[in-house]
Amino acid sequence: MIHKREPAAYMDVLLLADESEELIRSYMKEGDFYAITVDGRTAGGCVCTSPDESTIEIKNIALKEAFRRQGIGKAAIKKIEALYRNKGKTDVIAGTSNSSIENLLFYQKAGFRFHSIKKDFFLSYPEPFYENGIRGIDMVVFHKKL
């Protein structure tokens, strides 16, 4: 289901969750990349970083359209949580855009709670982006105890 891999070959998947290739390249170096597979096929990918000793941050998680709404993303999160819990992490955080309605639902259904808002976070992106007719401006940060 999740397999540690070199992220460069999965840029197309990571771009599904983050519009800035430049930013993806910067945080890919900071953490671990996991390919999410189903029956040997690449379904998606996830980049995890460690902002501090006790916390894991899901910097980017994305599934290809054909694999969405089947419980695969939630199962991948559970595997990642177990992996890092076994490494001594106690908390997991994840951020998404204020305009990413599906992601806001996804994280809550996966047991995350609202934690904070990073105002104007996405204004630093090279190009503005819109989802659901809403401009992505603020980052909504979610938290979950492991």
Segments predicted by a language model, with ranges:
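Acetyl-CoA-dependent GNAT
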Residues: 1-65, 118
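Conserved beta-strand-loop-alpha-helix junction that forms the acyl-donor binding cleft
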Residues: 94-104, 115, 119-125
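Conserved GNAT acetyl-CoA-binding A-motif
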Residues: 84-97
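Conserved active-site tyrosine of GNAT-family acetyltransferases
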Residues: 106-107, 112
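Short, P/G- and charge-enriched loop/turn segments at secondary-structure junctions
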Residues: 21-23, 126-133
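Short acidic/polar active-site loop segments enriched in Thr and Asp
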Residues: 54, 90, 113
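Short hydrophobic/aromatic beta-strand or adjacent loop that forms the aromatic wall/cage
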Residues: 31, 136-141
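Conserved acetyl-CoA-binding loop-helix of GNAT-fold acetyltransferases
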Residues: 63, 69-82, 109
